[in-house]
């Protein structure tokens, strides 16, 4: 326990409370360890709503109900040093409440007055000192399988070892995650992938049986051998891709050099469900090869293939996100990333490209050009088998850099407006609007990028040539 622990300072914001109350949970645990306290959990023998109102008035904080069914209230803002959640004592009193908690290090209590000793009924102080995660009771995880994810997350966050009995209980309880509410599972998984070292946290989750319970398709990928261009099985490769995504996120200049700030800004942009684009890309990295087990084949030559794993994987990712009840925005981002993760690699041997050809790729992966390039690079870096040569990796990364340069250049030119809009082109060519018109507008955009269309006359001339090349009537 940290020598700097100050019980009175921790509980000072709770002075307006009138009924007996205690600080419990992760906030107390972190304070005892000398870690920053992001939130305080308070249990009270009084009326949580009335107590929340008293704190709100004293600190100018906002309050709102977390759960009317359980009588829990949350306070934020004002001059509160951190978020405060207030809820009633569960069961027959403090001891009963603490016995219902998950881990001994979370089953500690401190009187809200800041006076007296930390109440420890389950050896939590000892386990804090010994830096280990121990269950309060043998059925703690079975009663709520989502706690398996919490076990991995908190152990990783604190750098604690997981007690052997807790690990065994986690493996036994993990199958129950599939029957748990998707929203709760996704909330815990989001905390894992946004950890300081998400690859380490995910591997710890896997070690106690939780990863396959959350994403069964990844469990299917365990031990699935790949071609000689790979040095890892599919699951190992997937986790290494996640590592590379995080590494690029932290130091984009290592790959993208002068465009590091462009990458950093895009990955740091909020996307959905409390995740930034970069954090959502971590989830996409976990999903990108999830269909490889289902699509593995071996040719007569012995070559291992995974034909269509991008398309099938996109369908699997879509179904998974629906099970987890993610937002449509996050689901669409992940699905696009999985479906298109091979697109850049297919272009490596077709270089060099014109600006218009770069534009075709960028439009294909829109609105996620930066994230698509980061995932493509991470995927390439995690593919380093005996048949992979340094020049293959060099060419792939060079194309990614060139594509990022093109993205920056084209973005600076936007909006690229055609000299003639669709209605004007249809009228000039005396043709009814249809799919051909969208294709013509795309072709016109590419001609603009090449500098061959720049005004109405050049647009008219190009449109007539294009229609004629398609076997149509170019108009009068």
Placement of each model-derived feature along the sequence:
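Catalytic cores of the polymerase beta-like nucleotidyltransferase superfamily
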Residues: 1-476
């Amino acid at each position: 326990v940290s020598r700097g622990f100050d019980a009175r300072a921790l509980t000072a914001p709770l002075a307006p409370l009138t009924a007996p109350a205690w600080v419990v949970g992760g906030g107390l645990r972190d304070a005892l360890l000398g870690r920053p306290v992001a939130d305080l959990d308070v249990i009270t023998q009084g009326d949580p709503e009335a107590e929340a109102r008293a704190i709100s008035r004293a600190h100018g904080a906002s309050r709102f109900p977390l759960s009317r069914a359980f009588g829990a209230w949350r306070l934020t803002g004002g001059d509160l040093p951190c978020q405060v959640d207030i809820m009633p004592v569960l069961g027959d009193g403090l001891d009963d409440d603490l016995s219902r908690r998950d881990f001994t290090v979370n089953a500690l209590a401190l009187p809200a007055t800041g006076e007296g000793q930390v109440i420890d009924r389950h050896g939590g102080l000892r386990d804090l000192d010994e830096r280990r995660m121990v269950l309060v009771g043998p059925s703690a995880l079975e009663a709520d399988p989502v706690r398996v994810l919490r076990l991995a997350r908190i152990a990783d966050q604190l750098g604690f070892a997981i007690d052997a009995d807790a690990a065994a209980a986690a493996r036994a309880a993990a199958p129950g995650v599939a029957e748990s509410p998707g929203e709760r599972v996704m909330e815990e998984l989001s905390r894992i992938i946004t950890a300081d070292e998400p690859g380490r946290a995910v591997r710890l989750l896997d070690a106690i049986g939780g990863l396959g319970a959350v994403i069964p398709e990844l469990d299917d990928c365990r031990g699935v051998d790949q071609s000689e261009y790979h040095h890892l099985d599919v699951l190992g490769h997937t986790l290494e891709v996640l590592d590379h995504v995080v590494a690029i996120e932290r130091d984009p200049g290592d790959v993208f050099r002068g465009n590091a700030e462009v990458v950093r800004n895009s990955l740091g942009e909020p996307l959905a469900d409390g995740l930034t684009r970069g954090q959502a890309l971590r989830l996409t990295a976990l999903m990108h090869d999830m269909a490889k087990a289902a699509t593995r084949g071996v040719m007569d030559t012995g070559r291992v293939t995974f034909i269509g794993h991008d398309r099938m994987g996109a369908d699997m990712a879509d179904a998974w996100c629906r099970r987890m009840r993610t937002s449509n925005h996050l689901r669409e981002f992940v699905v696009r990333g999985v479906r298109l993760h091979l697109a850049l690699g297919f272009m490596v041997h077709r270089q060099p490209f014109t600006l218009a050809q770069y534009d075709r790729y960028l439009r294909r992966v829109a609105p996620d050009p930066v994230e698509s390039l980061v995932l493509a690079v991470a995927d390439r870096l995690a593919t380093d088998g005996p048949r992979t040569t340094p020049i293959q990796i060099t060419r792939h990364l060079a194309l990614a850099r060139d594509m990022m340069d093109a993205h920056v250049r084209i973005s600076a030119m936007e909006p690229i407006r055609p000299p003639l809009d669709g209605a004007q082109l249809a009228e000039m060519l005396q043709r009814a609007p249809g799919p051909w018109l969208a294709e013509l507008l795309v072709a016109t955009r590419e001609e603009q990028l090449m500098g061959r269309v720049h005004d109405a006359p050049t647009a008219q001339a190009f449109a007539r040539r294009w229609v004629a090349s398609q076997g149509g009537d170019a108009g009068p």
